[in-house]
């Protein structure tokens, strides 16, 4: 009974939760049913407290659904039960194995002869069966999913399954180091893996400009056009670098149109929303929005922890949960910063032979942590929010309850919880001596509104970017 009941719960939770969240917190739980009491065993106190805090209501709801009137009492314990609980089957390693395929295939993905790069270049048709510059290490299987990138990942998967027909073009935008480039490569690899003769080209926008200049210098612009207009998928990173390059924009405009007419996939990334890219023609910006435009947000706490745990696992390093949380709570801006910090911690541990503890991390990252703590303060958050919403600081800290003041105040409280290490009572004190329960309510309300309101989600993301830059 316990096996089938908990397996039902696991399967439903796996459907409802981001994969990184499920794998980290729910999958390790074991279950035992005795005397109508369902005991869930967690590997340590940290996981137990987290599960009970975050998922208790969801688990109780599922038990109510599956058991009707005969609902078992739910208990939590640290440890493991005598007999192993059934596990949800893990994803296969087929995609990961593909990343270590034959050297010839790797070379084909990473290099390609471009016929306009030398004088007297001939037709390009013979050179099109390649996977140009697609990095085989970046797959969907090693992309850590979270609420911040869930829509972007889902769209990228759809495009890789149906290139040229689902979301064309796909435009991903967001700050530096959030995973946009990883998704570009993942799409390229997925297309190539399902169709080995697909012609997929990944490049930075500056490389497109450089290629066009070489083609003009070598009197080979027609070869350049045929090359780029004959690919099955064109993946261009950092499209904002086309700004103020009129000839490049002109050529890309015609290439863009030709690819769309041929149902060939286009994926673009930028550090900002298409209409906010200065120096790019309106006709191009309009076309960028013809398909699907998706924001990639800075990772939330749970995703940052999952990223650290995944990277530590890749390095075959054990990283304790509390250490991962210590790092994730203090480094919030992007994935690249997290990975760089973890690499520094691992290098220091290897050099010194010391265990990776919170004290060790505090020492290894002291300059980085000091900078972060100096950059983001509650006072800074309050001033930024007040300026963003064009309200007075005095009103933000007052007892006024009108929505024009209360909502920015709640946002500022939620941001203070997210971006600083202050406790709820300390945050409450900073907002006019409010109780910690008021701060907790504000955090929960903003979390709810970010799911329901596009405007609140956009405001929150804009403020995060401003405060983290």
Swiss-Prot record:
Region (Domain IV, binds dsDNA) location: 350-469
GO cellular component, one term: plasma membrane
PROSITE patterns linked: DNAA
Domain notes: Domain I is involved in oligomerization and binding regulators, domain II is flexibile and of varying length in different bacteria, domain III forms the AAA+ region, while domain IV binds dsDNA.
Protein name per its UniProtKB record: Chromosomal replication initiator protein DnaA
Chain segments carrying region Domain I, interacts with DnaA modulators: 1-90
Complexes and interactors: Oligomerizes as a right-handed, spiral filament on DNA at oriC.
Lineage, broadest ranks: Bacteria, Pseudomonadati, Pseudomonadota, Gammaproteobacteria, Vibrionales
GO molecular function, one term: ATP hydrolysis activity
Gene3D superfamilies on file: 1.10.1750.10, 1.10.8.60, 3.30.300.180, P-loop containing nucleotide triphosphate hydrolases (3.40.50.300)
InterPro entries in the record: AAA+_ATPase (IPR003593), Chromosome_initiator_DnaA (IPR001957), Chromosome_initiator_DnaA-like (IPR020591), Chromosome_initiator_DnaA_CS (IPR018312), DnaA_C (IPR013159), DnaA_dom (IPR013317), DnaA_N_dom (IPR024633), DnaA_N_sf (IPR038454)
Species of the source: Aliivibrio fischeri (strain ATCC 700601 / ES114)
UniProt-annotated binding residues for ATP: 177, 179-181
Function: Plays an essential role in the initiation and regulation of chromosomal replication. ATP-DnaA binds to the origin of replication (oriC) to initiate formation of the DNA replication initiation complex once per cell cycle. Binds the DnaA box (a 9 base pair repeat at the origin) and separates the double-stranded (ds)DNA. Forms a right-handed helical filament on oriC DNA; dsDNA binds to the exterior of the filament while single-stranded (ss)DNA is stabiized in the filament's interior.
Location within or outside the cell: Cytoplasm
Keyword Secreted: no
Domain of life assignment: Bacteria
Pfam families documented for this protein: Bac_DnaA, Bac_DnaA_C, DnaA_N, Hda_lid
Residues covered by region (Domain II): 90-132
Entry's family note: Belongs to the DnaA family.
């Amino acid at each position: 009974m316990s096996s089938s009941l908990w397996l039902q719960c696991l399967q439903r939770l796996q459907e409802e939760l981001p994969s990184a969240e499920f794998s980290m917190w729910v999958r390790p739980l074991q279950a035992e049913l005795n005397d109508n009491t369902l005991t869930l065993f967690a590997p340590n106190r940290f996981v137990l407290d987290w599960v009970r805090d975050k998922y208790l209501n969801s688990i109780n709801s599922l038990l109510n659904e599956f058991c009707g009137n005969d609902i078992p009492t739910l208990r939590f314990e640290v440890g493991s039960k005598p007999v192993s609980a059934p596990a949800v089957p893990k994803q296969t390693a087929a995609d990961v194995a593909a990343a270590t395929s034959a050297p010839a295939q790797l070379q084909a993905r990473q290099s390609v002869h471009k016929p306009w790069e030398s004088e007297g270049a001939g037709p390009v048709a013979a050179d099109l069966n390649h996977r140009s510059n697609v990095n085989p290490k970046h797959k969907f299987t090693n992309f850590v999913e979270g609420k911040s990138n869930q829509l972007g990942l889902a769209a990228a998967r759809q495009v890789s399954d149906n290139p040229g027909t689902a979301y064309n073009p796909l435009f991903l935008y967001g700050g530096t180091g959030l995973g946009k480039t990883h998704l570009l490569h993942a799409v390229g690899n997925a297309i190539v893996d399902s169709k080995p003769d697909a012609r997929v080209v990944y490049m930075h926008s500056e490389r497109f400009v450089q290629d066009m200049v070489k083609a003009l210098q070598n009197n080979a612009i027609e070869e350049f056009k045929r090359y780029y207009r004959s690919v099955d998928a064109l993946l261009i990173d950092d499209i904002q670098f086309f700004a103020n390059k009129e000839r490049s924009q002109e050529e890309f405009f015609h290439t863009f149109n030709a690819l769309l007419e041929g149902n060939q996939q286009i994926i673009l990334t930028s550090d900002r929303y298409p209409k906010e890219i200065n120096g790019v023609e309106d006709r191009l910006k309009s076309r960028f929005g013809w398909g699907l435009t998706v924001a990639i947000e800075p990772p939330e706490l749970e995703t940052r922890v999952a990223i650290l745990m995944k990277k530590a696992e890749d390095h075959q390093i054990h990283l304790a949960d509390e250490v991962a949380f210590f790092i994730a709570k203090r480094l919030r801006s992007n994935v690249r910063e997290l990975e760089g910090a973890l690499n520094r911690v691992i290098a220091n541990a290897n050099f010194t032979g010391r265990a990776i503890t919170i004290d060790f991390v505090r020492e290894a990252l002291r300059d980085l942590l000091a900078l972060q703590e100096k950059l983001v303060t509650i006072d800074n958050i309050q001033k930024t929010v007040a300026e963003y919403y064009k309200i007075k600081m005095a009103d933000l800290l007052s007892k006024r309850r009108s929505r024009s003041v209360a909502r920015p105040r709640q946002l500022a409280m939620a941001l203070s919880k997210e971006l600083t290490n202050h406790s709820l009572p300390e945050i409450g004190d900073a907002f006019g001596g409010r109780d910690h329960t008021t701060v907790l309510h504000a955090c929960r309300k903003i979390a709810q509104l970010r799911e329901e309101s596009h405007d609140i989600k956009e405001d929150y993301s804009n403020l995060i970017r401003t405060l983290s830059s």
